[in-house]
Amino acid sequence: MIERNWNELIRPEKPQIETGADATRKARIVAEPLERGFGVTLGNALRRVLLSSLQGAAVTAIQIDGVVHEFSSLEGVREDVVDIVLNIKQLAVRMHAEGPKRMTLRATGPGPVTAGQIETPADIEILNPDHVLCTLDDGASVRMEFTVNNGKGYVPADRNRPEDAPIGLIAVDALYSPVKRVAYRVEPTRQGQSLDYDKLILEVETNGAVTPVDAVAYAARILQDQLQIFITFEEPKAKSADESKPELPFNPALLKKVDELELSVRSANCLKNDNIVYIGDLIQKTEAEMLRTPNFGRKSLNEIKEVLAGMGLHLGMDVPNWPPENIEDLAKKFEDQI
């Protein structure tokens, strides 16, 4: 059965999400348990896709009144144009439409000029409005125009310069990815009595254009889409729930272990010492047999009778074909009914 290649691998539970004060920018995502080696496999693949392949928006070109090239300086502006361009590269932008789009900045000194002073169209958001672009002296003023586009990955300035670029247009390196940092580590984790499994811990930081949780989801979807072409066979038809579960000649609740019942420590220890593991073992005992169990008294008997009554069961029941040979496998198959 080819499906055993993937069906018999352990699958992680729903990821645990840990966020700090700003859940829109930083999060730790934990997935466990994973088969040995899958922590590095998945962590490395997700990290590479997160940093390289998510769509975002960035400034691709600027024009500053009175500036012909990026090695100029502006009277009354403390930073030179090279520093201003570096500051502009750190703008965090979210676009709700296809680009390119234009933004404008007009400012008068004295004081710092921040990203929040940029005039944007309705479909553009500035996500770090307190970010300082430059500082003006008293009486100085500045006017800039920005071209914003959407894309993925890193695009160098020379590819952002149009062939018919006007004099004074400064092309900017564009880093479109909304993901600023990704780190992962793999730790051993327990599954049952075994420590031979992986726990993947992803730490993701974004610029706020997308949440870390959504960024990981998009990266996983990209990987899913790219890997799909390698699946060259038809999936075996999944069995329905009724087909996959055998008929039981007894109540599935009998497959529940007695240590899962809310019993006192004394009662639980008595059952354990008498090798009573499943409820199916317990209900076949009579009251007299239970009272002959060492340290088992009338109080424990009444406690167990009350718990069984709540399940529609009682002591002294006859259960044909108990215990079944594959009792542990049956308990897993019917755990949703136990």
UniProtKB/Swiss-Prot annotation:
InterPro entries: DNA-dir_RNA_pol_insert, DNA-dir_RNA_pol_RpoA/D/Rpb3, DNA-dir_RpoA, RBP11-like, RNAP_asu_C, RNApol_insert_sf. Gene3D superfamilies: 5' to 3' exonuclease, C-terminal subdomain, DNA-directed RNA polymerase, insert domain, RNA polymerase, RBP11-like subunit. It catalyses: RNA(n) + a ribonucleoside 5'-triphosphate = RNA(n+1) + diphosphate. GO terms for cellular component: cytoplasm; DNA-directed RNA polymerase complex. Pfam families: RNA_pol_A_bac, RNA_pol_A_CTD, RNA_pol_L. GO terms for molecular function: DNA binding; DNA-directed RNA polymerase activity; protein dimerization activity. Its EC number is 2.7.7.6. Keywords: DNA-directed RNA polymerase, Nucleotidyltransferase, Transcription, Transferase. Residues 250-338 are annotated as: Alpha C-terminal domain (alpha-CTD). It is an enzyme of class 2 (transferase). GO terms for biological process: DNA-templated transcription. Residues 1-234 are annotated as: Alpha N-terminal domain (alpha-NTD). DNA-dependent RNA polymerase catalyzes the transcription of DNA into RNA using the four ribonucleoside triphosphates as substrates. Belongs to the RNA polymerase alpha chain family. Homodimer. The RNAP catalytic core consists of 2 alpha, 1 beta, 1 beta' and 1 omega subunit. When a sigma factor is associated with the core the holoenzyme is formed, which can initiate transcription. The N-terminal domain is essential for RNAP assembly and basal transcription, whereas the C-terminal domain is involved in interaction with transcriptional regulators and with upstream promoter elements. This is DNA-directed RNA polymerase subunit alpha. It comes from Caulobacter vibrioides (strain NA1000 / CB15N). The lineage of its organism: Bacteria, Pseudomonadati, Pseudomonadota, Alphaproteobacteria, Caulobacterales. The gene is rpoA.
